[in-house]
């Protein structure tokens, strides 16, 4: 993307001139964690980084948005069992986000937008939205490139609403962005069909439950990547960029409905 929207490319003098209270500082959140046998560890990082860059490149000038580097390590303890998963404890991640919030608050900007590429961060980041609002007076926003299936997002029919991790959607986007890192010969359907029979205790149900990704299948993914395609990934990626653009426009004029 054009370096003009990268916050780190500004000098201290330029930052003071370019940023205002209505500027949006965008922080993408990635992850380095197991994604089954067919996807790379950096899947969430690749997606969060690419979609955030594309959105800020397209809508940054209009919305006065500035991009921070993508945070690679986040709260991935549901995958702690798998070698290669690099995760921060909830306490550490809260401290990191608090520190970043403090630094943003020291600039003229008073709005921070988190673009979260890892569903396991969602609950923690929703809490930090309010903490940063209370502690630093920032306007805080949490967006997702694609809403996780266990949080109300879409899922392929073959996934029974449980394309939670490494399923058709995520695999398709990676086939679009980094096909060289995807091994479709290892893609298999892994869906905990018994949960689909439950009324309340299930992904996205009224009753949440704690889980680790290997509670279900040894491969570590939950979904059906066998139907993934680069074409679907391209359409999903473009849709995510446009959706984030709408969000950025609304954030740029947000004032609690007053």
Task: Name each model-derived stretch.
Residues 114:
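Conserved SAM-binding loop
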Residues 1-111, 119-258:
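Extended, histidine- and acidic-residue-enriched regions that form the cofactor-binding/catalytic faces
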């Amino acid at each position: 993307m054009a370096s003009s929207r990268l916050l780190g490319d500004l000098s201290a003098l330029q930052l003071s001139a370019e940023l205002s209270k209505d500027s949006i500082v965008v922080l993408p959140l990635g992850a380095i964690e197991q994604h089954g046998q067919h996807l790379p560890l950096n899947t969430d990082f690749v997606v969060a980084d690419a979609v955030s860059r594309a959105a800020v490149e397209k809508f940054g000038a209009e919305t006065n948005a500035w991009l921070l580097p993508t945070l690679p390590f986040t709260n991935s303890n549901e995958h702690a069992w798998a070698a290669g998963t690099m995760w921060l404890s909830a306490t550490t991640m809260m401290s990191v986000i608090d520190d970043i919030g403090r630094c943003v608050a020291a600039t003229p900007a008073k709005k921070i937008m988190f673009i979260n590429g890892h569903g396991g961060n969602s609950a923690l980041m929703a809490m930090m939205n309010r903490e940063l609002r209370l502690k630093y007076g920032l306007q805080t926003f949490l967006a997702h490139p694609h809403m996780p299936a266990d949080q109300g997002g879409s899922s392929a029919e073959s996934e029974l609403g449980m394309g939670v991790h490494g399923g058709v959607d995520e695999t398709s986007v990676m086939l679009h962005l980094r096909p060289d890192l995807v091994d479709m010969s290892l893609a298999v359907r892994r869906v905990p069909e018994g949960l689909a029979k439950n009324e309340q205790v299930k992904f996205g149900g009224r009753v949440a439950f704690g889980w680790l990704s290997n509670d279900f299948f040894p491969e570590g993914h939950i979904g059906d990547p066998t139907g993934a395609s680069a074409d679907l990934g391209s359409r999903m990626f473009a849709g995510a960029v446009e959706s984030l653009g709408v969000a950025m426009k609304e954030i740029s004029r947000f004032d609690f409905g007053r």
